[in-house]
Protein backbone atom coordinates (compact mmCIF):
# COMPACT_ATOMS: atom_id res chain seq x y z
CA UNK A 1 0.00 0.00 0.00
CA UNK A 2 1.29 3.46 -0.92
CA UNK A 3 1.45 6.00 1.94
CA UNK A 4 -1.10 8.12 0.05
CA UNK A 5 -3.34 5.06 -0.45
CA UNK A 6 -3.30 5.68 -4.21
CA UNK A 7 -3.35 2.75 -6.60
CA UNK A 8 -0.01 2.20 -8.40
CA UNK A 9 -1.27 3.82 -11.62
CA UNK A 10 -2.93 6.91 -10.10
CA UNK A 11 -1.54 10.45 -10.24
CA UNK A 12 -1.74 12.80 -7.31
CA UNK A 13 -4.45 15.47 -7.60
CA UNK A 14 -3.17 17.74 -10.39
CA UNK A 15 -4.39 21.31 -10.87
CA UNK A 16 -3.25 23.99 -13.31
CA UNK A 17 -4.31 27.57 -12.62
CA UNK A 18 -3.55 30.15 -15.31
CA UNK A 19 -3.36 33.94 -15.27
CA UNK A 20 -1.74 34.02 -11.84
CA UNK A 21 0.76 36.74 -12.82
CA UNK A 22 -0.73 39.91 -14.27
CA UNK A 23 2.50 41.02 -15.93
CA UNK A 24 3.77 37.89 -17.67
CA UNK A 25 2.68 36.98 -21.19
CA UNK A 26 1.81 33.54 -19.81
CA UNK A 27 1.63 32.06 -16.33
CA UNK A 28 0.59 28.85 -14.61
CA UNK A 29 0.50 27.63 -11.03
CA UNK A 30 0.71 23.85 -11.19
CA UNK A 31 0.14 21.51 -8.27
CA UNK A 32 0.89 17.81 -8.03
CA UNK A 33 -0.56 17.06 -4.61
CA UNK A 34 1.49 19.16 -2.18
CA UNK A 35 4.11 20.08 -4.81
CA UNK A 36 3.43 23.57 -6.15
CA UNK A 37 5.37 25.34 -8.90
CA UNK A 38 4.74 28.83 -10.27
CA UNK A 39 5.76 29.26 -13.92
CA UNK A 40 5.86 32.55 -15.81
CA UNK A 41 6.61 33.03 -19.51
CA UNK A 42 8.35 36.23 -20.60
CA UNK A 43 8.66 37.28 -24.24
CA UNK A 44 11.75 39.28 -25.14
CA UNK A 45 12.34 40.79 -28.57
CA UNK A 46 15.93 39.64 -28.72
CA UNK A 47 17.92 36.44 -28.65
CA UNK A 48 21.21 35.37 -27.04
CA UNK A 49 24.26 36.71 -28.83
CA UNK A 50 25.15 33.36 -30.34
CA UNK A 51 21.66 33.18 -31.93
CA UNK A 52 21.69 36.60 -33.61
CA UNK A 53 21.13 36.86 -37.35
CA UNK A 54 20.19 33.18 -37.63
CA UNK A 55 16.52 33.82 -38.31
CA UNK A 56 15.41 31.78 -35.33
CA UNK A 57 14.33 32.28 -31.75
CA UNK A 58 15.07 30.58 -28.48
CA UNK A 59 13.19 29.06 -25.56
CA UNK A 60 14.98 28.80 -22.25
CA UNK A 61 14.16 28.15 -18.61
CA UNK A 62 15.30 28.99 -15.11
CA UNK A 63 14.44 26.97 -12.01
CA UNK A 64 14.65 27.72 -8.33
CA UNK A 65 13.20 26.82 -4.97
CA UNK A 66 11.92 29.24 -2.36
CA UNK A 67 13.87 28.99 0.90
CA UNK A 68 11.05 27.25 2.77
CA UNK A 69 9.83 25.06 -0.09
CA UNK A 70 11.03 22.05 1.91
CA UNK A 71 10.89 20.82 5.49
CA UNK A 72 13.83 22.98 6.52
CA UNK A 73 14.86 26.38 5.20
CA UNK A 74 17.47 26.42 2.47
CA UNK A 75 19.54 29.49 1.66
CA UNK A 76 18.75 31.30 -1.56
CA UNK A 77 21.27 30.44 -4.25
CA UNK A 78 21.67 34.15 -4.93
CA UNK A 79 22.95 34.55 -1.36
CA UNK A 80 25.41 31.71 -1.93
CA UNK A 81 26.68 33.35 -5.11
CA UNK A 82 26.21 30.37 -7.40
CA UNK A 83 23.67 27.85 -8.64
CA UNK A 84 23.91 24.24 -7.54
CA UNK A 85 24.60 21.52 -10.06
CA UNK A 86 21.06 20.22 -9.44
CA UNK A 87 19.52 23.59 -10.33
CA UNK A 88 21.53 23.86 -13.54
CA UNK A 89 20.65 20.30 -14.54
CA UNK A 90 16.92 20.85 -13.98
CA UNK A 91 16.63 24.15 -15.81
CA UNK A 92 18.50 22.73 -18.80
CA UNK A 93 16.10 19.78 -18.79
CA UNK A 94 13.09 22.11 -18.78
CA UNK A 95 14.49 24.15 -21.68
CA UNK A 96 15.33 21.05 -23.74
CA UNK A 97 11.88 19.62 -23.12
CA UNK A 98 10.10 22.74 -24.35
CA UNK A 99 12.33 23.23 -27.39
CA UNK A 100 11.45 19.69 -28.47
CA UNK A 101 7.97 20.94 -29.40
CA UNK A 102 8.85 24.40 -30.74
CA UNK A 103 9.78 25.41 -34.29
CA UNK A 104 12.42 27.99 -33.42
CA UNK A 105 12.44 29.48 -36.92
CA UNK A 106 8.70 30.12 -36.73
CA UNK A 107 9.27 31.89 -33.41
CA UNK A 108 11.37 34.53 -35.14
CA UNK A 109 14.30 36.30 -33.53
CA UNK A 110 12.82 36.52 -30.05
CA UNK A 111 13.29 34.60 -26.83
CA UNK A 112 10.71 33.19 -24.44
CA UNK A 113 12.00 32.59 -20.93
CA UNK A 114 10.18 30.27 -18.55
CA UNK A 115 10.84 30.99 -14.88
CA UNK A 116 9.92 28.02 -12.69
CA UNK A 117 9.78 28.76 -8.98
CA UNK A 118 9.05 25.95 -6.55
CA UNK A 119 6.74 27.26 -3.83
CA UNK A 120 6.44 23.91 -2.07
CA UNK A 121 8.25 20.65 -2.76
CA UNK A 122 6.85 17.18 -2.11
CA UNK A 123 8.55 15.24 -4.90
CA UNK A 124 8.41 15.67 -8.67
CA UNK A 125 9.26 19.37 -8.88
CA UNK A 126 11.11 19.08 -12.20
CA UNK A 127 8.31 17.11 -13.86
CA UNK A 128 5.71 19.55 -12.53
CA UNK A 129 7.80 22.45 -13.84
CA UNK A 130 7.96 20.97 -17.34
CA UNK A 131 4.24 20.25 -17.44
CA UNK A 132 3.31 23.71 -16.17
CA UNK A 133 5.89 25.46 -18.34
CA UNK A 134 4.26 24.12 -21.50
CA UNK A 135 0.97 25.70 -20.41
CA UNK A 136 2.61 29.07 -19.71
CA UNK A 137 4.46 28.89 -23.03
CA UNK A 138 1.30 27.99 -24.93
CA UNK A 139 -0.57 30.95 -23.41
CA UNK A 140 2.30 33.33 -24.22
CA UNK A 141 2.44 32.15 -27.83
CA UNK A 142 -1.34 32.46 -28.13
CA UNK A 143 -0.96 36.08 -27.04
CA UNK A 144 1.66 36.71 -29.74
CA UNK A 145 -0.60 35.13 -32.36
CA UNK A 146 -3.61 37.18 -31.25
CA UNK A 147 -1.57 40.39 -31.35
CA UNK A 148 -0.33 39.59 -34.86
CA UNK A 149 3.30 39.44 -33.73
CA UNK A 150 3.48 35.87 -35.01
CA UNK A 151 1.87 34.70 -38.24
CA UNK A 152 2.60 30.99 -37.79
CA UNK A 153 2.19 28.98 -34.61
CA UNK A 154 5.68 27.83 -33.56
CA UNK A 155 4.39 25.24 -31.08
CA UNK A 156 4.17 21.91 -32.89
CA UNK A 157 2.99 19.69 -30.04
CA UNK A 158 2.62 19.14 -26.34
CA UNK A 159 5.21 18.00 -23.84
CA UNK A 160 4.69 16.84 -20.27
CA UNK A 161 6.58 14.87 -17.66
CA UNK A 162 6.01 12.59 -14.70
CA UNK A 163 8.02 10.58 -12.22
CA UNK A 164 7.71 6.83 -11.71
CA UNK A 165 9.50 4.47 -9.38
CA UNK A 166 9.74 1.07 -7.78
CA UNK A 167 8.33 1.38 -4.26
CA UNK A 168 8.30 -1.73 -2.06
CA UNK A 169 8.96 -3.81 -5.19
CA UNK A 170 5.93 -2.34 -6.98
CA UNK A 171 6.20 0.02 -9.99
CA UNK A 172 4.19 3.16 -9.18
CA UNK A 173 3.27 6.43 -10.89
CA UNK A 174 3.99 9.95 -9.63
CA UNK A 175 6.02 9.57 -6.45
CA UNK A 176 5.62 12.00 -3.58
CA UNK A 177 8.58 12.74 -1.30
CA UNK A 178 7.82 9.96 1.17
CA UNK A 179 7.79 7.38 -1.63
CA UNK A 180 10.75 8.88 -3.47
CA UNK A 181 12.94 8.81 -0.36
CA UNK A 182 12.26 5.09 0.11
CA UNK A 183 12.07 3.94 -3.52
CA UNK A 184 14.27 1.11 -4.77
CA UNK A 185 14.42 2.87 -8.14
CA UNK A 186 13.12 6.14 -9.51
CA UNK A 187 12.75 7.72 -12.92
CA UNK A 188 11.52 10.78 -14.77
CA UNK A 189 9.87 10.53 -18.18
CA UNK A 190 9.43 13.45 -20.60
CA UNK A 191 7.21 12.61 -23.57
CA UNK A 192 5.42 14.45 -26.38
CA UNK A 193 1.80 14.02 -27.37
CA UNK A 194 2.82 12.01 -30.45
CA UNK A 195 4.70 9.52 -28.30
CA UNK A 196 8.23 10.78 -28.87
CA UNK A 197 10.69 10.43 -26.00
CA UNK A 198 12.37 13.70 -25.06
CA UNK A 199 14.23 12.39 -22.03
CA UNK A 200 14.26 9.49 -19.60
CA UNK A 201 16.18 9.63 -16.33
CA UNK A 202 16.19 6.32 -14.47
CA UNK A 203 18.28 5.30 -11.48
CA UNK A 204 18.53 2.28 -9.24
CA UNK A 205 18.67 3.73 -5.74
CA UNK A 206 18.66 0.72 -3.42
CA UNK A 207 19.05 -1.96 -6.06
CA UNK A 208 19.13 -2.42 -9.79
CA UNK A 209 15.85 -2.78 -11.61
CA UNK A 210 14.89 -5.24 -14.32
CA UNK A 211 13.97 -4.67 -17.95
CA UNK A 212 10.46 -5.82 -17.05
CA UNK A 213 10.21 -3.26 -14.24
CA UNK A 214 11.44 -0.53 -16.58
CA UNK A 215 8.78 -1.41 -19.14
CA UNK A 216 6.15 -1.24 -16.41
CA UNK A 217 7.45 2.20 -15.39
CA UNK A 218 7.32 3.34 -19.01
CA UNK A 219 3.73 2.14 -19.36
CA UNK A 220 2.76 3.97 -16.17
CA UNK A 221 4.43 7.14 -17.46
CA UNK A 222 2.57 6.96 -20.77
CA UNK A 223 -0.73 6.61 -18.92
CA UNK A 224 -0.01 9.45 -16.52
CA UNK A 225 1.34 11.81 -19.17
CA UNK A 226 -1.67 11.10 -21.36
CA UNK A 227 -3.84 12.39 -18.51
CA UNK A 228 -1.59 15.43 -18.11
CA UNK A 229 -1.97 16.32 -21.79
CA UNK A 230 -5.73 16.53 -21.28
CA UNK A 231 -5.29 18.75 -18.22
CA UNK A 232 -2.90 21.03 -20.11
CA UNK A 233 -5.40 21.61 -22.90
CA UNK A 234 -8.20 22.21 -20.42
CA UNK A 235 -6.08 24.81 -18.63
CA UNK A 236 -5.19 26.63 -21.85
CA UNK A 237 -8.80 26.56 -23.02
CA UNK A 238 -9.96 28.09 -19.74
CA UNK A 239 -7.28 30.81 -19.74
CA UNK A 240 -8.65 34.34 -19.96
CA UNK A 241 -7.27 36.69 -22.64
CA UNK A 242 -4.47 38.91 -21.37
Curated annotation (Swiss-Prot):
Question: Which keywords annotate this record?
Answer: Nucleotidyltransferase, RNA-binding, rRNA processing, Transferase, tRNA processing, tRNA-binding
Report whether tRNA processing shows up as a keyword of the record.
yes
Q: So where does phosphate get bound?
A: 86, 124-126
Question: Could you tell me the EC number(s) of this protein?
Answer: 2.7.7.56
The record's GO molecular-function terms, alphabetically, read:
3'-5'-RNA exonuclease activity; tRNA binding; tRNA nucleotidyltransferase activity
Q: Which reactions does this protein catalyse?
A: tRNA(n+1) + phosphate = tRNA(n) + a ribonucleoside 5'-diphosphate
Give GO terms for biological process.
rRNA catabolic process; rRNA processing; tRNA processing
Function, as annotated, reads:
Phosphorolytic 3'-5' exoribonuclease that plays an important role in tRNA 3'-end maturation. Removes nucleotide residues following the 3'-CCA terminus of tRNAs; can also add nucleotides to the ends of RNA molecules by using nucleoside diphosphates as substrates, but this may not be physiologically important. Probably plays a role in initiation of 16S rRNA degradation (leading to ribosome degradation) during starvation.
Quaternary data: Homohexameric ring arranged as a trimer of dimers.
Sequence similarity = Belongs to the RNase PH family.
Q: What is this protein called?
A: Ribonuclease PH
- Which species is listed as the source? Caulobacter sp. (strain K31)
